[in-house]
Amino acid sequence: MKPIVIIGAGISGLQAARLLEIQGANYFLLEKSNKIGGRVQSETVDGFVLDHGFQVLQTAYPEVQRSLDLKKLDLSYFGSGAYVYLTSHFQPFFNPFEKPFAFLRSLGSGLVTAKDLVLLGYVWFRLQRDVEALDGRKETVGELIDRLGFSTNFKSLFLRPFMSGVLLDARLSQPASLFYFYMKQFMEGKAAIPKAGIGAIASQLADIIPTNRIRLEAPVTHISADFVELESGEQLEFSQLILATEAPITSDLLGVSKADVEPLGSETFYFRAKGIYGMEPYLHLMPEGSPLLHFSCLTAIDPHSSLKGDYLFSATSLTIGISSEEIKRILADHLGVPASDFQFIKSFPIPHSLWRVSDFQTLKKEAEKRNIVLAGDYTQFPSLQAALSSGRLAAETVLEKVQ
């Protein structure tokens, strides 16, 4: 029988290949670049492990629990909550459901009001039910936050910056249901970083896949009814095809318009610092409107990430192209330390960190017409959960077809 062919060795493609391998299927995984993982990449610079963009592993995701061995990833965890910048200092906002007494102490800070506490109770009650990531309603996250009636300070200093970081969308124009979905994940799980970097997720998925099943530097240029053609001119026949590429590449390969593909970009900067400056293992949020979205001291999260007494900081902006000197200045000003304490290591501008939620009907209809199975987080919603889920569903679909 002709093999199943998977195009794209990002998380969705790796997940599909992993499950096909478990089922003993005949398949090949094609990847245009020289490495697996897609957007989920890490690299080591001057002894520091740097992720490509600010990426965390959410332990409560059902597909994460189903697919990954979290113990082997050797995770370090962010604290549940965040520090927000209030007037001239950072004020902790602890998860009220994890540290209720510490949270209550913040009521007099000016960040949270008694009404906010009541509204958070409503959100908590809402999260006790099953929460769909996408429920079909047209309301946006920003509109939902305004409608709920939280105080101005709580919205502008915590809710909006926090959700902007989750969605990489300053306008908060993603579906409102994602607000409840992500809040439930943060309430029930933890945000974590693998010791070897976020790229360890891709490596773990690939561990089970024999090297002769993966072909790197094998860009596909054309898809026919029963074969794919590589840039080299080689043709590979297939029985079933899984297209696990990014939405724009999928559009190109299917020959359809990219009109419904809208990327959400970000740039993450890494600095070596002389001190930890009393920072706790929490995300530090900047006020709404700041060119810097958030930052954290990764050494506070994983003390073993220090190199020769130095400390690793990451800082993320939704503005691609902002200078590292500007980011350094903002960091220094808000921590009250000299800018010379920070030494720039590297930045990762990623124009397509995530994709704005769309129904992608043009892509889906064309793929269905040609008997091609799509995979990728864009087919559901932007997250590791959706990438893993879509890869699993794609594998299950093609296995049913070939049986």
Residue ranges and their predicted role:
Residues K2-L29, L399:
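N-terminal Rossmann-like FAD-binding beta1-loop-alpha1 element of flavoenzymes
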Residues E21-V45:
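Glycine-rich FAD pyrophosphate-binding loop
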Residues S42, D46-G79, G110-T113:
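Conserved FAD-binding subdomain of flavin-dependent enzymes
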Residues Q55-P62, A133-E139, L148, K184-A206:
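Short beta-strand to alpha-helix junction loop
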Residues Q65, D74-L172, M187:
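Mobile amphipathic helical/loop "lid" adjacent to a hydrophobic cofactor/ligand pocket
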Residues F179-F227, Q240:
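Helical element adjacent to the flavin cofactor pocket in flavoenzyme catalytic cores
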Residues T221-R329, D333-H334:
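Mid-domain catalytic core of redox enzymes
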Residues L298, P303-Q403:
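Conserved flavin/dinucleotide-binding core of flavoenzymes
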